């Protein structure tokens, strides 16, 4: 995947995460702040940071619950070396339902 393709997929994914949280967080318990390639989610558990790392072609997640992760885009999913999926971690920790493959 070239840099342009990576940027488009990563930016679409990060925007999708922000959108899904805003749609499903009916109590407005998560403060969503999307600034460029960086998404901050301020929750009662702490602050999550999700950002695009262009040089590594990864999305990085910093979770106040489970720590840091680096995800690569392979076979239509953002997964880390241990096989964990970005959307699965966010679903579990934020109680927001995400599709595996955002459009």
From Swiss-Prot:
GO terms for cellular component: cytoplasm. It holds the Pfam family Frataxin_Cyay. Keywords: Iron, Metal-binding. SMART domains: Frataxin_Cyay. GO terms for biological process: intracellular iron ion homeostasis; iron-sulfur cluster assembly. GO terms for molecular function: 2 iron, 2 sulfur cluster binding; ferric iron binding; ferrous iron binding; ferroxidase activity; iron chaperone activity. Signal peptide: none annotated. InterPro entries: CyaY (IPR047584), Frataxin/CyaY (IPR002908), Frataxin/CyaY_sf (IPR036524), Frataxin_CS (IPR020895). Belongs to the frataxin family. Involved in iron-sulfur (Fe-S) cluster assembly. May act as a regulator of Fe-S biogenesis. This is Iron-sulfur cluster assembly protein CyaY. It comes from Rickettsia peacockii (strain Rustic). The gene is cyaY.
């Amino acid at each position: 995947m070239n840099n342009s393709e990576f940027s488009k997929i990563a930016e679409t994914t990060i925007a999708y995460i922000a959108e899904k949280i805003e749609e499903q967080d009916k109590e407005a318990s998560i403060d969503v702040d999307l600034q460029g390639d960086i998404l901050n989610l301020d929750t009662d558990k702490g602050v999550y940071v999700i950002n695009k790392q262009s040089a590594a072609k990864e999305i990085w997640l910093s979770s106040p619950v489970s720590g840091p992760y680096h995800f690569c885009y392979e076979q239509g999913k953002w997964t880390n070396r241990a096989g964990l999926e970005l959307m699965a971690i966010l679903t579990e920790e934020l109680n927001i339902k995400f599709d595996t493959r955002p459009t």
